[in-house]
């Protein structure tokens, strides 16, 4: 099985890059993992609703171009379903058993995900109502994926 993480925007801060690299190294023993960083559109401070929509649509098309036809897609969105770590682990496990060769996670840019991306997603997931920088979200997601594999293995990592 392969895991794919698609993000809008590139990691800039050294501490985030190091954290992501550490979890990518840990995850490699369980699954092939591919991370794709897409260019983000510049969003003016006082952008109109139509300008924000245009930006979402452009970023959404970039995201959709990287999703395989048979991928199981989990979009991260504030309105998505919140899961405890054990249920998240079970979700990944079920998709592996169901025969999906790739589980793709999608993290949008500062404006979130376009409606087309949300529609393409098989599952919308939320990490809570807090607003987090999308770059930090990549690190949080990778830690939770690693935790899911540790739960599956029955290791004491998840207490």
From Swiss-Prot:
Keyword Cytoplasm attributed: yes
Protein name listed in UniProt: Ribosomal RNA large subunit methyltransferase H
Keyword Manganese assigned: no
Role summary: Specifically methylates the pseudouridine at position 1915 (m3Psi1915) in 23S rRNA.
Primary gene name: rlmH
Superkingdom of origin organism: Bacteria
GO cellular component entries: cytoplasm
Pfam families reported in the protein's UniProt record: SPOUT_MTase
Enzyme nomenclature, EC number: 2.1.1.177
Subunit-level organization: Homodimer.
Catalytic activity from the UniProt record: pseudouridine(1915) in 23S rRNA + S-adenosyl-L-methionine = N(3)-methylpseudouridine(1915) in 23S rRNA + S-adenosyl-L-homocysteine + H(+)
């Amino acid at each position: 099985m392969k895991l794919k993480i698609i993000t809008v925007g590139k990691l800039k801060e050294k501490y985030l890059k190091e954290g992501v690299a550490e979890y990518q190294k840990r995850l490699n023993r369980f699954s092939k993992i591919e991370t794709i960083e897409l260019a983000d559109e510049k969003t003016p401070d006082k952008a109109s609703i139509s300008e924000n929509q245009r930006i979402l649509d452009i970023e959404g098309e970039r995201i959709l171009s990287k999703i395989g036809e048979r991928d199981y897609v989990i979009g991260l969105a504030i309105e998505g379903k919140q899961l405890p770590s054990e249920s998240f682990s079970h979700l990944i496990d079920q998709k592996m058993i169901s025969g999906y060769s790739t589980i793709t996670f999608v993290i949008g840019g500062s404006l979130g995900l376009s409606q087309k991306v949300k529609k393409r997603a098989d599952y919308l997931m939320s990490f809570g109502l807090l607003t987090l920088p999308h770059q930090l979200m990549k690190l949080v997601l990778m830690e939770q994926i690693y935790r899911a594999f540790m739960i599956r293995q029955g290791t004491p990592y998840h207490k």
